[in-house]
Amino acid sequence: MTIGNFRPATVLIDETAILHNIQHEVARLKKQTQLFAVVKADAYGHGMLRVARVAKAAGATGFCVAILDEALGLRKADYSEPVLVLGIVPSQYAAIAAAQTISLPVSSTEWLEQALPVLEAQPELPPLRIHLALDTGMGRIGFTEDQALKTAVAFVEAHPKQFVIEGVFTHFATADAPDDTYFKQQVNKFNHLVNLLPSRPRYVHVSNSATSLWHAACNGNMIRYGVAIYGLNPSGDAIPTTPFPLEPALSLESELTYCKQVHAGDGISYGVTYRAKGDEFIGTVPIGYADGWLRRLQGFHVLVDGQYCEIVGRICMDQFMIRLPKAYPAGTKVVLVGQSGDQEITLLDVAKYSKTIHYEIACNLTPRLKRQSVNPVD
């Protein structure tokens, strides 16, 4: 997708906020515990390479991504730190990961059996580093049964030139919820499955951001620090208190490209779902659903000159309209996410109106929106 460098629409990334969010967590870690920065999905829309650079400066010792392509992107950018892919990678690409010392998750012996000939065909490669995924209640990927796990471990031990168990992990479904009943059930199942292993691998990890913030007593020597890097509370506001203040790193700003006066009954946008109730000033903002500012945000608001202005009419692919309190010239700043005067719109505000989570809003901001760092970290 082409980046819109020549229109007034910018995602601003506060690098110092990212630095502080990581440094505060690193300072809380138990001795010998490492922090891997989760930079999947272009670092939740914040820019993978930008965040990786700041995370490394803040004390992160490795990275987690969702797909092999993201891991290769880090290697191409000369990041030599450990990189763990969290999603299942098709077995035919196992040699690519091994050649780049990229760690992959394993959820079945079948995957190992399929990857074996791929790795045997290139005997010069180091063993593929694998992390055994344990499904303790997320229902996504991972071993669930004792015997299946034992069989996989035995297979790996029988092929030491092709595989090495570097880690074991699980993912919690409710670590961000006030009720920890299900969370504790998952902890118990994880401990049971880990105890089946002949020895503990280098990395034993269960902690995502929510677990690290609110359940620090969990066993493990590595945390997968994700959404909190970006200053977002993993629970939304279900658990409003965090051990330290999280500093939001992302804001979204634009400008008015056009302002006009309309009169009672005049229609706005597709379907004429909004008609002026009287003489009104309508401003046009050059962002639309192709940028991730979705149609469901009709009726929400943005900030102009420190005042909330309602989005009126349907949001178009590339533009939307707002009702202004008075006439403003083209070029007037419009804040979609962030502060203006004494007022603020957060990603969580946008998410609540959209009936979703703030993770999704950040990730939906498309590459067409140019990214720009503020408060840069050297």
From Swiss-Prot:
Domain of life, per lineage: Bacteria
Reactions it catalyzes: L-alanine = D-alanine
Membership in a protein family: Belongs to the alanine racemase family.
GO BP terms in the entry: D-alanine biosynthetic process; peptidoglycan biosynthetic process
Metabolic or biological pathway, per its Swiss-Prot or TrEMBL entry: Amino-acid biosynthesis; D-alanine biosynthesis; D-alanine from L-alanine: step 1/1
GO terms for MF: alanine racemase activity; pyridoxal phosphate binding
Cofactor(s), names only, from the UniProt record: pyridoxal 5'-phosphate
Cited SMART domains: Ala_racemase_C
Catalytic site positions: 40, 270
Keyword Isomerase annotated: yes
Gene that produces this protein: alr
Biological source species: Lacticaseibacillus casei (strain BL23)
Gene Ontology cellular-component terms listed: cytosol
Keywords attached to this entry: Isomerase, Pyridoxal phosphate
Protein name: Alanine racemase
Residues recorded as bearing N6-(pyridoxal phosphate)lysine in the entry: 40
EC number: 5.1.1.1
Function: Catalyzes the interconversion of L-alanine and D-alanine. May also act on other amino acids.
Class of enzymatic activity (EC top level): isomerase
